[in-house]
């Protein structure tokens, strides 16, 4: 991903979730994806897809069961 794409995605996510604590980067990975952090903690990866001239982005976030609060 180009730095301009990363900056646009970061602004979109910050606006959508209402926080400036979301950070993308620091740089694009070899496969064209970029890491997403919230307050310094890694939370997921954004993948870029281009098909038939249209670009889309997929955000993947894995949640470990041990990180969840106890069941009620």
Protein language model annotation of sequence segments:
Residues 1-72:
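Terminal leader/tail segments of proteins
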């Amino acid at each position: 991903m180009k730095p301009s794409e990363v900056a646009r995605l970061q602004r979109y996510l910050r606006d959508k979730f209402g926080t400036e604590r979301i950070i993308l980067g620091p740089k694009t990975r070899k496969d064209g994806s970029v890491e997403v952090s919230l307050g310094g903690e890694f939370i997921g990866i954004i993948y870029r897809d281009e098909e038939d001239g249209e670009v889309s982005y997929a955000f993947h976030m894995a949640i470990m069961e041990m990180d969840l609060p106890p069941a009620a």
